[in-house]
Amino acid sequence: MSIQLGIIGGGVMAEAILARLIAEKTYAPEEIIVGEPHGARRDYLQKTYQVRVSPDNQEAANVSEVLLLAVKPQVLDRVLASLAGGANRPLVISILAGVSLQRIQKGFPDHAIIRAMPNTPATVGAGMTAIAANKMVEPDQLAKAKAIFSAVGNVVEVPENLMDAVTGVSGSGPAYVALMIEALADGGVLAGLPRAIAQKLALQTVLGTAELIKETEEHPAQIKDKVTSPGGTTIAGVAVLEKMGFRSAIIEAVRAAYRRSQELGKK
């Protein structure tokens, strides 16, 4: 069976994508090769997932139809140098945060390239990935990229100039939500609940509310209004959140992350 997917880098996000692709049968293990410099990590990936591994990035690039770049941005130039001069022209997909299509294009002239931004829930198959393609990408290649990231959650296609905004919402968003869950649980502890119960209540409340909004397709404000009865407990809590600037704090957090992403992209 021919190699369909090459992954450069065998870190946490790369492994998460690899595991889900195999579990979802998007690719068979024998269709995947991973280029990874560390011997212990190569051994682990080979034994755990039965994929082909190699210390040579060029080997992975030369035999793959799709090449997924999953290295740290600070080693990108070195990795691109190791891939230079290959005869093969795979579809290149980059998941490097803050790295533009133009920068990837310098290492892969005349290649179809897709920039992707998955978030950390992808590690459990509940991710949100935004993708942006250059002009060389054909419809069938775009479909392949969407299939890869559909294995780890949901996918949306956006123009590249919106990727910094994506970073502010879904890229950084898991931290905001985690902070809110922690604060909600802390409030429960303050009110007398045992920590374990408070955390379980907070977690399931966030999960359940997100699922409710997703399934009903109602605006979040409609869900809020249904819970807030006149003179009741919920509206009392909502009033405090509004007074303390909860809504504007979230908006400003997104804007700050967006601006920081823009700054990092210029370096």
From Swiss-Prot:
BP GO terms, sorted: L-proline biosynthetic process
Pathway given in the UniProt record: Amino-acid biosynthesis; L-proline biosynthesis; L-proline from L-glutamate 5-semialdehyde: step 1/1
Main location: cytoplasm
EC number per UniProt: 1.5.1.2
Keywords of this entry: Amino-acid biosynthesis, Cytoplasm, NADP, Oxidoreductase, Proline biosynthesis
Keyword ATP-binding on entry: no
The UniProt record lists the keyword Cytoplasm: yes
A molecular function GO annotation: pyrroline-5-carboxylate reductase activity
Annotated catalysed reactions: L-proline + NADP(+) = (S)-1-pyrroline-5-carboxylate + NADPH + 2 H(+); L-proline + NAD(+) = (S)-1-pyrroline-5-carboxylate + NADH + 2 H(+)
Catalytic class of the enzyme: oxidoreductase
Annotated SUPFAM superfamilies: 6-phosphogluconate dehydrogenase C-terminal domain-like, NAD(P)-binding Rossmann-fold domains
Entry-linked Gene3D superfamilies: NAD(P)-binding Rossmann-like Domain, ProC C-terminal domain-like
Location(s) in or outside the cell: Cytoplasm
GO CC term, one of those recorded: cytoplasm
UniProt-listed NCBIfam families: proC (TIGR00112)
Family recorded in the similarity comment: Belongs to the pyrroline-5-carboxylate reductase family.
Free-text function comment from the UniProt entry: Catalyzes the reduction of 1-pyrroline-5-carboxylate (PCA) to L-proline.
Protein name: Pyrroline-5-carboxylate reductase
